[in-house]
From Swiss-Prot:
Possible metal-dependent hydrolase. One of its GO terms (cellular component) is cytoplasm. It comes from Bacillus cereus (strain ATCC 14579 / DSM 31 / CCUG 7414 / JCM 2152 / NBRC 15305 / NCIMB 9373 / NCTC 2599 / NRRL B-3711). Its main location: cytoplasm. Belongs to the metal hydrolase YfiT family. One of its GO terms (molecular function) is zinc ion binding. It is found in: Cytoplasm. Its EC number is 3.-.-.-. Binds 1 zinc ion per subunit. This is Putative metal-dependent hydrolase BC_2708.
Length: 173
Protein backbone atom coordinates (compact mmCIF):
# COMPACT_ATOMS: atom_id res chain seq x y z
CA UNK A 1 0.00 0.00 0.00
CA UNK A 2 1.19 3.52 -0.79
CA UNK A 3 2.20 5.70 2.13
CA UNK A 4 -0.29 8.56 1.83
CA UNK A 5 2.02 10.76 3.90
CA UNK A 6 4.70 10.65 1.20
CA UNK A 7 2.99 10.41 -2.19
CA UNK A 8 6.23 11.35 -4.02
CA UNK A 9 8.56 9.72 -1.49
CA UNK A 10 10.75 11.42 1.06
CA UNK A 11 13.26 14.08 0.09
CA UNK A 12 16.44 12.69 -1.43
CA UNK A 13 18.98 14.14 -3.82
CA UNK A 14 22.00 13.03 -5.81
CA UNK A 15 25.44 14.27 -4.84
CA UNK A 16 27.13 16.40 -5.88
CA UNK A 17 24.45 19.04 -6.35
CA UNK A 18 24.86 20.52 -9.82
CA UNK A 19 23.89 23.88 -11.27
CA UNK A 20 21.27 22.05 -13.34
CA UNK A 21 19.73 20.59 -10.19
CA UNK A 22 19.64 24.04 -8.57
CA UNK A 23 18.02 25.54 -11.70
CA UNK A 24 15.40 22.77 -11.77
CA UNK A 25 14.62 23.21 -8.09
CA UNK A 26 14.31 26.98 -8.39
CA UNK A 27 11.96 26.50 -11.34
CA UNK A 28 9.84 24.13 -9.23
CA UNK A 29 9.69 26.73 -6.46
CA UNK A 30 8.71 29.34 -9.04
CA UNK A 31 5.99 27.07 -10.45
CA UNK A 32 4.50 26.09 -7.09
CA UNK A 33 1.89 28.87 -6.75
CA UNK A 34 0.39 27.89 -10.13
CA UNK A 35 0.66 24.15 -9.46
CA UNK A 36 -1.01 24.45 -6.05
CA UNK A 37 -3.74 26.67 -7.51
CA UNK A 38 -4.40 24.06 -10.22
CA UNK A 39 -4.48 21.29 -7.61
CA UNK A 40 -7.36 22.93 -5.71
CA UNK A 41 -9.22 24.29 -8.74
CA UNK A 42 -12.98 23.83 -8.50
CA UNK A 43 -12.92 22.20 -5.06
CA UNK A 44 -15.91 23.13 -2.92
CA UNK A 45 -15.79 23.98 0.79
CA UNK A 46 -16.55 20.40 1.85
CA UNK A 47 -13.72 19.10 -0.31
CA UNK A 48 -11.33 21.76 1.01
CA UNK A 49 -12.18 20.61 4.53
CA UNK A 50 -11.50 16.93 3.73
CA UNK A 51 -8.33 15.43 5.21
CA UNK A 52 -5.94 14.11 2.58
CA UNK A 53 -5.58 10.97 4.75
CA UNK A 54 -7.05 9.66 8.00
CA UNK A 55 -5.50 11.71 10.79
CA UNK A 56 -3.98 14.14 8.30
CA UNK A 57 -4.56 17.78 7.56
CA UNK A 58 -7.43 19.01 5.46
CA UNK A 59 -6.74 20.32 1.98
CA UNK A 60 -7.31 23.82 3.38
CA UNK A 61 -4.75 23.26 6.15
CA UNK A 62 -2.24 21.89 3.64
CA UNK A 63 -2.52 25.05 1.52
CA UNK A 64 -2.08 27.31 4.55
CA UNK A 65 0.80 25.15 5.83
CA UNK A 66 2.72 25.51 2.58
CA UNK A 67 2.67 29.29 2.99
CA UNK A 68 3.63 29.10 6.68
CA UNK A 69 6.53 26.79 5.86
CA UNK A 70 7.78 28.75 2.87
CA UNK A 71 7.63 32.04 4.78
CA UNK A 72 9.86 30.46 7.39
CA UNK A 73 12.19 29.15 4.70
CA UNK A 74 12.45 32.56 3.01
CA UNK A 75 13.49 34.10 6.32
CA UNK A 76 15.99 31.27 6.90
CA UNK A 77 17.59 32.03 3.53
CA UNK A 78 17.86 35.72 4.34
CA UNK A 79 19.40 34.93 7.72
CA UNK A 80 21.92 32.53 6.18
CA UNK A 81 22.87 35.10 3.55
CA UNK A 82 23.46 37.87 6.09
CA UNK A 83 24.81 36.01 9.15
CA UNK A 84 27.32 33.21 9.66
CA UNK A 85 25.49 29.90 10.21
CA UNK A 86 22.59 31.43 12.17
CA UNK A 87 20.54 29.22 14.46
CA UNK A 88 16.99 29.41 13.19
CA UNK A 89 13.81 29.16 15.22
CA UNK A 90 11.82 25.97 14.71
CA UNK A 91 8.06 26.15 14.89
CA UNK A 92 5.33 23.65 15.74
CA UNK A 93 3.71 23.23 12.33
CA UNK A 94 0.99 20.93 13.69
CA UNK A 95 -0.01 23.66 16.19
CA UNK A 96 0.12 26.37 13.51
CA UNK A 97 -2.29 24.27 11.43
CA UNK A 98 -4.82 24.50 14.27
CA UNK A 99 -4.74 28.31 14.56
CA UNK A 100 -7.78 30.27 13.34
CA UNK A 101 -6.05 31.62 10.23
CA UNK A 102 -5.85 28.05 8.91
CA UNK A 103 -9.62 28.18 8.46
CA UNK A 104 -9.52 31.21 6.16
CA UNK A 105 -10.35 30.84 2.47
CA UNK A 106 -7.45 29.27 0.59
CA UNK A 107 -7.30 32.24 -1.79
CA UNK A 108 -5.78 34.30 1.03
CA UNK A 109 -2.80 31.96 1.21
CA UNK A 110 -2.55 31.48 -2.56
CA UNK A 111 -2.13 35.23 -3.06
CA UNK A 112 0.42 35.31 -0.26
CA UNK A 113 2.28 32.32 -1.74
CA UNK A 114 2.43 33.93 -5.16
CA UNK A 115 3.90 37.16 -3.76
CA UNK A 116 6.28 35.35 -1.44
CA UNK A 117 7.57 33.13 -4.23
CA UNK A 118 8.15 36.09 -6.53
CA UNK A 119 10.48 37.58 -3.92
CA UNK A 120 12.06 34.26 -2.96
CA UNK A 121 12.72 33.20 -6.55
CA UNK A 122 14.25 36.61 -7.29
CA UNK A 123 16.58 36.07 -4.34
CA UNK A 124 17.39 32.48 -5.39
CA UNK A 125 18.26 33.46 -8.96
CA UNK A 126 20.64 36.12 -7.60
CA UNK A 127 22.70 33.62 -5.59
CA UNK A 128 26.33 33.06 -6.49
CA UNK A 129 27.93 29.62 -6.25
CA UNK A 130 29.56 30.52 -2.93
CA UNK A 131 26.16 31.57 -1.52
CA UNK A 132 24.88 28.03 -2.04
CA UNK A 133 27.47 26.83 0.49
CA UNK A 134 26.18 29.15 3.21
CA UNK A 135 24.34 27.45 6.03
CA UNK A 136 21.81 27.82 8.78
CA UNK A 137 21.60 25.69 11.88
CA UNK A 138 18.34 24.03 12.88
CA UNK A 139 18.39 23.08 16.59
CA UNK A 140 16.82 19.68 15.82
CA UNK A 141 18.21 18.73 12.39
CA UNK A 142 21.56 20.51 12.40
CA UNK A 143 23.39 22.46 9.73
CA UNK A 144 21.81 22.85 6.28
CA UNK A 145 23.47 24.30 3.19
CA UNK A 146 21.33 26.64 1.12
CA UNK A 147 21.88 24.40 -1.93
CA UNK A 148 20.22 21.52 -0.06
CA UNK A 149 17.48 23.77 1.33
CA UNK A 150 16.53 24.82 -2.22
CA UNK A 151 16.01 21.16 -3.09
CA UNK A 152 14.17 20.47 0.14
CA UNK A 153 11.66 23.26 -0.40
CA UNK A 154 11.17 22.39 -4.08
CA UNK A 155 10.34 18.87 -2.88
CA UNK A 156 8.16 20.26 -0.07
CA UNK A 157 5.94 22.11 -2.52
CA UNK A 158 5.59 19.09 -4.82
CA UNK A 159 5.01 16.84 -1.77
CA UNK A 160 2.03 18.84 -0.51
CA UNK A 161 0.63 19.43 -3.99
CA UNK A 162 0.71 15.65 -4.42
CA UNK A 163 -1.25 15.23 -1.17
CA UNK A 164 -4.06 17.15 -2.85
CA UNK A 165 -3.79 15.66 -6.35
CA UNK A 166 -3.58 12.10 -5.01
CA UNK A 167 -6.65 12.73 -2.81
CA UNK A 168 -8.52 14.06 -5.85
CA UNK A 169 -7.55 10.96 -7.81
CA UNK A 170 -8.54 8.55 -5.01
CA UNK A 171 -11.93 10.22 -4.55
CA UNK A 172 -12.57 10.93 -8.25
CA UNK A 173 -12.87 14.68 -7.75
Amino acid sequence: MNDLRYPIGQFTYKRPITEEMIDTWIQEIEDLPNELTKAIKDLDQKQLDTPYRVGGWTVRQVVHHVVDSHMNSYIRFKLALTEKNPTIKPYKEEKWAELPDSKLPVDVSLVMLDSLHKRWVNLLYSLEIEDLEKTFNHPETGETKLAVAIGLYAWHGRHHTAHITSLRKRLNW
